[in-house]
């Protein structure tokens, strides 16, 4: 928790904006996680304005790469994401958005977008025994 006060009232505070490492289209990945269970629900993308709206409205706003417009999860489905916290990773190229998810997070109707795709085959790694 920080005691720094930011002004995101009309645009993303320049001190926050300066910490972001955006892709070529000006976007940062946002990992959406249920705040109390830590379940990973989905990944979306935010530009500066989507992040500003997320930080100031209590609802998650994304930038739709396919529709080229802002969208708030739940405006049409009722499956709202209420913001509980937002963190920036150490490289500045990803956000962790903790939410209280109402209903399904995935457009398929599943709670998590990571249920439909399913697990991929892996060779499981093991930590060496301590000596």
Swiss-Prot record:
It is found in: Cytoplasm. InterPro entries: PRA-CH, PRib_AMP_CycHydrolase_dom, PRib_AMP_CycHydrolase_sf. GO terms for biological process: L-histidine biosynthetic process. Its EC number is 3.5.4.19. Keywords: Amino-acid biosynthesis, Cytoplasm, Histidine biosynthesis, Hydrolase, Magnesium, Metal-binding, Zinc. Binds 1 Mg(2+) ion per subunit. It catalyses: 1-(5-phospho-beta-D-ribosyl)-5'-AMP + H2O = 1-(5-phospho-beta-D-ribosyl)-5-[(5-phospho-beta-D-ribosylamino)methylideneamino]imidazole-4-carboxamide. Its cofactor is Mg(2+); Zn(2+). GO terms for cellular component: cytoplasm. Mg(2+) binds at residues 89, 91, 93. Homodimer. Belongs to the PRA-CH family. This is Phosphoribosyl-AMP cyclohydrolase. It comes from Bifidobacterium longum (strain NCC 2705). The lineage of its organism: Bacteria, Bacillati, Actinomycetota, Actinomycetes, Bifidobacteriales.
């Amino acid at each position: 928790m920080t005691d720094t006060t930011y002004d995101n009232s009309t645009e993303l505070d320049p001190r926050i904006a300066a910490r972001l490492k955006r892709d070529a289209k000006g976007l940062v990945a946002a990992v959406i996680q249920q705040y109390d269970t830590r379940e990973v629900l989905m990944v979306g993308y935010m530009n500066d304005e989507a992040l500003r709206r997320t930080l100031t409205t209590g609802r998650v706003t994304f930038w739709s790469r396919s529709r080229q417009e802002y969208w708030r999860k739940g405006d049409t489905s009722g499956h709202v994401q209420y913001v509980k916290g937002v963190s920036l990773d150490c490289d500045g190229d990803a956000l962790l958005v903790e939410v209280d998810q109402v209903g399904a997070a995935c457009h398929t109707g599943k709670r998590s977008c990571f249920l439909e795709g399913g697990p991929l085959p892996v060779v499981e790694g093991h930590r060496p025994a301590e000596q």
